[in-house]
């Protein structure tokens, strides 16, 4: 009996300082219109808390599994049949503020099939640079 193809997953985490308030940043992290400006080719609401992230004309469905206004959002990716799966890939954006310096930090947690850490770092640096252009920070 053949075992299912199980891919190793990694939890990649990185933080970036951003010169914008959480109130300005959050819609870019948690809404289809905001995400489509910097994160992927397009994002569309499908139903309720489900979204379709489109990269290179390929659909990737996800569900908002948690959200705290102006603070954090988590997207859990669904299978090809738009169903939840155990050990699903997820993406989490969290905004933190330093009480001492008054700086705002974007923490990204990308849990997905194993990738080269340097490649992921470079990818997220490019994406966050696009986000900074959008918010002026």
Q: Could you describe each region identified by the protein language model?
A:
Residues 1-44:
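Hydrophobic ligand-binding cavity/cleft-lining segments
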Residues 5, 9, 20, 50-51, ...:
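Charge-dense, helix-prone N-terminal extensions
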Residues 13, 58-62, 85-92:
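Short, surface-exposed coil-to-beta transition loops
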Residues 22-23, 65-71, 95-105:
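A short, structured loop/turn motif at beta-sheet edges
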Residues 25, 31, 47, 64-66, ...:
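A structural signal for the main folded, soluble domain(s) of proteins
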Residues 25-26, 35, 64, 75, ...:
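Hydrophobic pocket/interface hotspot
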Residues 36-81:
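Glycine-rich portal/gate segments that line the openings of hydrophobic small-molecule binding cavities
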Residues 80-133, 137:
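Beta-strand/loop substructures that line and gate deep hydrophobic ligand-binding cavities in soluble
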């Amino acid at each position: 009996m053949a075992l299912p193809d199980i891919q190793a997953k990694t939890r990649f985490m990185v933080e970036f300082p951003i010169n914008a308030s959480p109130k300005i940043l959050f819609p870019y992290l948690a809404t289809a219109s905001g995400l489509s400006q910097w994160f992927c080719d397009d994002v569309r609401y499908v139903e309720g808390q489900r979204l379709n992230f489109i990269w290179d004309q390929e659909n990737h469905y996800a569900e908002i599994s948690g959200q705290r206004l102006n603070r954090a959002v988590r997207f859990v990716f669904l299978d090809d049949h738009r169903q939840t799966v155990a050990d699903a890939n997820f993406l989490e954006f969290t905004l933190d503020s330093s009480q001492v310096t008054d700086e705002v930090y974007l923490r990204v947690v990308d849990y997905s099939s194993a990738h080269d850490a340097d490649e992921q770092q470079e990818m997220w640096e490019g994406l966050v640079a696009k986000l900074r252009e959008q918010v002026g920070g």
